[in-house]
């Protein structure tokens, strides 16, 4: 009877089979075994004996030695030991190749006269990087924000010393994204970002989500490893198409150089069509380094002419056309409801700012119908707040009088808004008078919106008008009748006087109040001309005080992160805004916590002579979080206190002028110096401010009329 060990040995395959299967499994040549494998045939090798019974432990070792000895005698032919095919194909021709010298001023390649039979021959002989530059020219791109890296070098080499557009190099890719947002919000043109693969691309995820939340057009081009390396966990490889799918309107990887012009056209069209937003184009290195050898369809190389672009439900034609208004019958029905209303209110959002005509039509609607206007945070500037019909911003930290008026209105005219939770408060209790009027057939909610998914998503509208908001307004305004609503306007005016924005002024020897700083800026900006000013902010209490105490009068003068609430947004977005409007005062009102997240971008502003002005509130706290901890967490300040650097010295170390204001009596003089400083150089004015709460405030889960008022107003609350 065989022992257990001998039975196991019977199951071992012949040694030559073991060796050959091992070689196949590893895809290796026989070089590593050349010291102990012969090159002659193995056919006559004697078969090993496995059947000898093993009764002692020592014999186990002896049996193993016999197997090893037999393995050393195995002979192998060259054909048997040949290496298996490589796991990957050879890299593309241009991958890892030394870049070819590019002329200092790459010429523009005109397609006129090079289109035959519907094919464009103008790109033949150009690299993917050169095609990228040409497409930027065709889309009239004047500014690019980005950061180089290995996978995107063919593109950076193609735009080397390009005279056709300017490039701003930030200190972090997130900064590039926010700069592109600021540029887009002020100019109305899509912001363009160019970064490398891996971390370069993932660092732009936050700006893309921010742009998606606030409807900002942005086109992000990122490098990628060569196509033959995709999926191999190569250096700086990341599935950025998968990662960015939920934070972009559309994304794509370009897999062949011939499709590059078409994909770029699609990106710009989708970013700017309908509700604007971010798109991403992933560019593998071998695609941007390759040379185009064949003509491409002419239409695919022309901006706005992409025959493969999915149809826009509002514009089925692939050709450019004017924005389409909503259904004419619904617009007429909306006009009839407005004309019959006794207490209508206009609720204007960012959609009104999508066209220069939007604010003009909004004013005409308000004046003609004698209708008060309130705005969202992103709608600031759409309506002149000096107008007596202005109710300023609505919502969690909006004006008390706007919140009260919203609850009393019998007709709500919502223009380009999403009904965000910061605006509605508890949805079930939002606009109760309008809902009651709808039930009685004498009023209700009218919602003008371009994005279908926003219709009836949060608040049910009695008249939903799907289409371009500004185009719909152009159809609506002529149908509005002049109605005497002096009683309603008078009630709104009385409420404004009863519940103004309020704070307790600072006393001698005390720190500045942040509200005082914003009011001084507003006073001096009014004297210089509000049309010359653009204000950006970070996220936090300072953002709300800027909304409340600066009087907004001009479209596209407000740049802030609303939907996502991105701390660190203020400074880089101000840089982008200043690039878009170099002739204007661009001021970043920021808090110490928010500013610290992207403070290194001061070095960018200094390097490129971008004259942004940072008005910095320093209270050494994460103020908004501290306020919630005060009100709802029994003053337990869990990790909200800041230890800050010397911001003046920090600014000076980056080539930026720094000022510090500690007393109210010095504020007017220092604000004047701050505003009059060289418009081509950045400056920081740090104001040491006290910790304050932002009022009014609507607690989570409460209705608009259940807002917390400033202590000075609470005795008179309704």
Curated annotation (Swiss-Prot):
Q: Where does Mg(2+) bind?
A: 592, 619
Q: Top enzyme class of this protein?
A: transferase
Q: Where is this region: Disordered?
A: 1-50, 72-101, 296-327
Could you say which residues bind FAD here?
Answer: 275, 397-418, 449-468
Q: Where in the cell is it found?
A: Mitochondrion
Q: Which SUPFAM superfamilies match?
A: DHS-like NAD/FAD-binding domain (SSF52467), Thiamin diphosphate-binding fold (THDP-binding) (SSF52518)
Q: Name one GO biological process term.
A: isoleucine biosynthetic process
Q: Where is the composition biased (Low complexity)?
A: 76-99, 306-325
List all Polar residues biased stretches: 32-45
Q: Which cofactor does it need?
A: Mg(2+); thiamine diphosphate
Query: Which EC number applies?
Result: 2.2.1.6
Q: What's noted on cofactor binding?
A: Binds 1 Mg(2+) ion per subunit.
Give the residue ranges for region: Thiamine pyrophosphate binding.
541-621
Asked whether the UniProt record includes Metal-binding among its keywords, one would answer: yes
Q: Which GO terms describe its molecular function?
A: acetolactate synthase activity; flavin adenine dinucleotide binding; magnesium ion binding; thiamine pyrophosphate binding
What's any one GO cellular component for it?
mitochondrion
Catalysed conversion reaction: 2 pyruvate + H(+) = (2S)-2-acetolactate + CO2
Protein name stated in the entry: Acetolactate synthase, mitochondrial
Q: Which organism is it from?
A: Cryptococcus neoformans var. neoformans serotype D (strain JEC21 / ATCC MYA-565)
Name the gene behind this protein: ILV2
């Amino acid at each position: 009877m065989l022992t257990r060990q001998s039975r196991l040995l019977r199951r071992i395959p012949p040694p030559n089979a073991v060796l050959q299967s091992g070689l196949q499994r590893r895809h290796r040549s026989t070089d590593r075994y050349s010291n102990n494998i012969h090159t002659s045939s193995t056919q006559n090798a004697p078969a090993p004996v496995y059947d000898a019974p093993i009764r002692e432990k020592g014999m186990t070792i002896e049996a193993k030695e016999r197997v090893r000895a037999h393995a050393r005698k195995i002979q192998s032919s060259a054909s048997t030991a040949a290496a298996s095919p490589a796991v990957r194909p050879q890299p593309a021709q241009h991958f890892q190749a030394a870049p070819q010298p590019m002329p200092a001023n790459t010429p523009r390649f005109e397609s006129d006269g090079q289109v035959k039979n519907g094919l464009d021959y103008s790109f033949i002989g150009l690299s993917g990087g050169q095609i990228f530059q040409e497409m930027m020219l065709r889309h009239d791109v004047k500014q690019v924000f980005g950061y180089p890296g290995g996978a995107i070098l063919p593109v950076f080499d193609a735009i080397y010393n390009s005279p056709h557009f300017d490039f701003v190099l930030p200190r972090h890719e997130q900064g590039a994204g926010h700069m592109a947002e600021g540029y887009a919000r002020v100019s109305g043109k899509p912001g363009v970002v160019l970064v490398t693969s891996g971390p370069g691309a993932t660092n732009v995820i936050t700006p893309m989500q921010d742009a998606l939340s606030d409807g900002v057009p942005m086109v992000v081009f990122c490098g990628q490893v060569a196509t033959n390396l995709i999926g191999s966990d190569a250096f700086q490889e990341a599935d950025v198409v998968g990662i960015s799918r939920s934070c972009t309107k559309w994304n794509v990887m370009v897999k062949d150089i011939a499709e590059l012009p078409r994909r770029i056209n699609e990106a710009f069209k989708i970013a700017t069509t309908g509700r604007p937003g971010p798109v991403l184009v992933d560019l593998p290195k071998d695609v941007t380094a390759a040379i185009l050898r064949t003509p491409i369809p002419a239409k695919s190389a022309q901006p706005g002419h992409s025959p493969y672009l999915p149809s826009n439900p509002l514009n089925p034609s692939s050709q450019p056309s004017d924005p389409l208004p909503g259904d004419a019958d619904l617009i007429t029905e909306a006009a009839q409801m407005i004309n019959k209303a006794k207490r209508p209110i206009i609720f204007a959002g960012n959609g009104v700012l999508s066209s220069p005509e939007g604010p003009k039509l909004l004013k005409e609607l308000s004046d003609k119908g004698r209708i008060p206007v309130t705005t969202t945070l992103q709608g600031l500037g759409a309506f002149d707040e000096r107008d007596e019909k202005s109710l300023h911003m609505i919502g969690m930290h909006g004006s008390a009088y706007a919140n009260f008026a919203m609850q009393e209105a019998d007709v709500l005219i919502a223009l380009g808004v999403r009904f965000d939770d910061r605006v509605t408060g508890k949805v079930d209790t939002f606009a109760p008078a309008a809902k009651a009027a709808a039930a009685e057939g004498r009023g209700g909610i009218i919602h003008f919106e371009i994005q279908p998914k926003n219709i009836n998503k949060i608040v049910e509208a009695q008249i939903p008008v799907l289409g371009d908001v500004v185009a719909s307004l152009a159809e609506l305004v002529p149908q509005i009748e002049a109605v005497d609503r002096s009683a309603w306007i008078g009630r709104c005016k009385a409420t404004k006087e009863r519940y103004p924005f309020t704070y307790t002024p600072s006393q001698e020897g005390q720190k500045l109040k942040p509200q005082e700083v914003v009011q001084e800026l507003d006073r001096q900006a009014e004297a210089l001309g509000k049309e010359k000013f653009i204000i950006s902010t970070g996220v936090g209490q300072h953002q709300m005080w800027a909304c409340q105490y600066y009087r907004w009068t001009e479209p596209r003068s407000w740049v802030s992160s609303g939907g996502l609430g991105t701390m660190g947004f203020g400074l880089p977005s101000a840089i982008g805004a200043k690039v878009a409007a170099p002739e204007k005062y661009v001021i970043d009102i920021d808090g110490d916590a928010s500013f610290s997240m992207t403070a290194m971008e001061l070095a960018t502003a200094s390097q490129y002579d971008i004259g942004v002005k940072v008005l910095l509130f320093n209270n050494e706290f994460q103020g908004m979080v501290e306020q919630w901890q005060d009100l709802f967490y029994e003053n337990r300040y869990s990790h909200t206190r800041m230890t800050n650097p010397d911001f003046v010295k920090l600014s000076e170390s980056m080539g930026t002028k720094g000022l510090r204001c500690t007393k109210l009596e010095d504020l007017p003089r220092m604000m004047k110096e701050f505003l009059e400083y060289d418009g081509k150089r950045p400056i920081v004015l740090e104001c040491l401010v006290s910790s304050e709460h932002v009022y009014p405030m609507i607690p989570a889960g409460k209705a608009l009329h259940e807002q917390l008022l400033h202590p000075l107003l609470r005795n008179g609350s309704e």
